Structures are given as structure tokens and as C-alpha cells.
Amino acid sequence: MSANDAARGANHRRTALLHCVLVAVLAAVLALGSAAVAAEIRLADDSGRSVTLKQPAQRIISLAPHVTELLFAAGAGEHVVGTVEYSNYPAAAQRIPRIGDSAQLDLERIVALKPDLIVVWQNGNAQRQLDKLLRLGIPVFYNASRRLSDIARAIEQLGRLAGTETIASPTARAFVAREAGLRQRYARLALVTVFYQIWDKPLMTVNGDHLISDVIRLCGGQNVFADLKLLTPVISTEAVLAADPEAIGGVTAEPGQAGNLDGWKKWPRLKAVARDNLFVIPADLITRNTPRILDGAQQLCGHLEAARARRGR
């Protein structure tokens, strides 16, 4: 082989090697780009806004007790770095730093915690405060779940935002299955008319759009004030007496407390009183849009089942 042939062969090999290197580098760049795109999370929140995260959230602030509980249910509890007062479940939530409450937030504290995601309660946080948060440039995700059917979806959403789908998805499926089991057992039974008292002074109840009404329907009950326009309307004693519900439910802060329904015993001819159908359920189990709502639902279903059995009285 001549010297020229050897030189041409060497050049050819160098060119081929350079080509291979360039192809490998290009492939690596494309792979990195694809990974970056794949890691990006884009999700519509309950207000219809599109929320984009460059990667799963690692430092989350929750602005409602039920949102905190949902984040833990979705497997993202360890990523929650700040929350509001009354975030008391699970026990680990009680150790999370507080940044205010639904009425007043400590914006400086929020910024100092360096969150990469803030989850707010669209129906419960003051809009003026939310507007300030949006101006900070931190991704804000609105949760507005009101129905039982919204809870599993919220768990799935939060799991996706935090990259904890392997926990969130089975948790959501288990919730749906348990709800379906309760619905199958109770929803087709004879309707029981129900007045649900959430406050006594002034006397307040819920309309048909409230989560409590959804639970009442699940259990085969009918809210006697479902048609009122306000979500939590003030009503009169006379309106309750005229409706003459078969059962009266209430809320209590802690399990085992008596609640505030004793005042109805002044009217012994009221069906709920005459048949001993006054009951209370811990507020956190009947008013929070979390998996524990089904614990409260199970209690409520049991009370309505007892009310059916007492119709002969």
C-alpha cells in the first residue's frame, strides 16, 4: 500500500469516527431535550387556568386544611413545606410550618419558604390574597372540589403535580370503589327527609350543591332545603318545623361531643325528635373534601338506616 493510500485510509477512518461522535452527541442532545419536555407538567386547574411546572413540585404550600389532607393522600405530604391553621390530619400535617389562615396569609413567610407550587382553595381563600400570590410568579393551582366525584380527581391531579402518581392513582381508585359500594347499598332505599344544621346562632344549613347534600343523597336521603339558592343559607326555626324532617343532623368539633341539637327537643312532635333521629358527625368527616368524607358518609348512612327502621313509631 502506498503512503498516499495509507493517508487516505486514515482520513476516511477519522471522518467516520467524527461522524459517529457527532451522531452520538446529537442523539444525546435530543434525548436531553425529550427528557426535559417529558418532565414538564401542564395541567388545567379547577378555575380553567393552565398551570405549568418544569418538573414535579418539591416544595408545596397548601392554603386549606382539606388541600393538605389531599396532598398527603396523593403521596405528596413530604413535599408540603407550609400550610394554614387547622391543617390537623394526618398527624404529620400538624408539624408543618404555618403561614396564616384562609383570611390572612403571611406573604413574606410564603416567599421565604421558596415554594415551587401553591395549592389554593378557590372557594375559601380571599381573592385579594390570591391576586398577590399570582403576582409573585409562583405557580398557583386552584382546587374547587365540591362533590364526592371531585375528590378522586383532585387526588390524581395533585399526584401528577408532585410526581407521586404511583401512590395517588391507587388511592383515587380505592376512594371511587368505596363510594360505589356505599351508593349501591344505600342510594336506592326509601328516601329519608333530612335537615342538616351546620350552625345554631344564626341557624344555618346547606343547599343541594353542598358536599353534605351529596353525602345525604349517597345515603338515600333528601335535603329538605336543597332548593335554596345560597350554599349555606340562614333559615328560620319555623321553616324547619314546616319541613318536619324525619332526621336532623349536625356537626361537632370532636368525636363523642354532643353537638348543638338539643334545642330541637322543645318540639316533641317534630318527626326527628319523636323518633329519636337527632345525630351529629365530626365536622372534619362530613365537611372536608377528602377521602375521610366516606367515614362520615358511613356514619350518616347508618343514621338514616336507623331512621327508616323507626318509621313505625
Label the predicted regions.
Residues 44-48, 99-108, 124, 228-237:
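Short helix-initiation/N-cap motifs at beta->coil->alpha
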Residues 107-114, 136, 235-244:
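Short helices/loops that flank or line small-molecule/ion binding pockets
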